[in-house]
Swiss-Prot record:
Function field: Single strand-specific metallo-endoribonuclease involved in late-stage 70S ribosome quality control and in maturation of the 3' terminus of the 16S rRNA.
GO BP annotation list: rRNA processing
Family in the record: Belongs to the endoribonuclease YbeY family.
Keyword Cytoplasm attributed: yes
Organism: Streptococcus pneumoniae serotype 2 (strain D39 / NCTC 7466)
Gene: ybeY
GO cellular component, one term: cytoplasm
Protein name: Endoribonuclease YbeY
Keyword line: Cytoplasm, Endonuclease, Hydrolase, Metal-binding, Nuclease, Ribosome biogenesis, rRNA processing, Zinc
Length: 165
């Protein structure tokens, strides 16, 4: 899985970038999404607040914002078109590969790690996996959706080795 990571805060260590890369690759493997691409941007609470207002019409910072990529253009090509034009086939596969972007608030991650009594590493892993599941179509609006998403989230974090302790 290709993951573009940007640290707008200047506060994310190389080790944390590496952990985020590894846990997202691990989650992608669990979901069969190894051939996908995504972006992760680490932001401050101030930037998170701006993004939350812009994308979710919510006037406060949040821990992770997940923007699932859904191409606006519905372009239909038949198999013959793609066989005759390899560049077109390659371009279409690139559109299919990109699944979305996460914005993770470093400030919120620190606050929540302290609040929940676990490590910053665990909180960052949790936020990355939580956001990753959102951009792959998981949600928690209903009790059934919540049970499915949170169960998978915990399964991934535990299998990776990021437990609550």
């Amino acid at each position: 899985m290709y993951i573009e990571m940007v640290d707008e805060t200047g506060q994310v260590s190389k080790e944390m970038l590496q952990q985020t890369q590894e846990i997202l690759e691990f989650a992608a493997q669990k979901l069969g999404k190894e051939d996908k691409e995504m972006a992760v941007t680490f932001v401050t609470n101030e930037r998170s607040h701006e993004l939350n207002l812009e994308y979710r019409d919510t006037d406060r910072p949040t821990d992770v914002i997940s923007l699932e990529y859904k191409p606006e253009l519905e372009i239909a090509f038949d198999e013959e078109d793609l066989l005759e034009n390899p560049e077109l086939a390659e371009m279409m596969s690139e559109f299919d590969a990109y699944i979305g972007e996460l914005f993770i608030s470093i400030d919120k991650a620190h606050e929540q790690a302290e609040e929940y009594g676990h490590s910053f590493e665990r909180e960052m892993g949790f936020l990355a996996v939580h956001g990753f599941l959102h951009i792959n179509g998981y949600d928690h609006y209903t009790p059934e959706e919540e049970a499915e998403m949170f169960g998978l989230q915990e399964e991934i974090l535990t299998a990776y080795g990021l437990t609550r302790q």
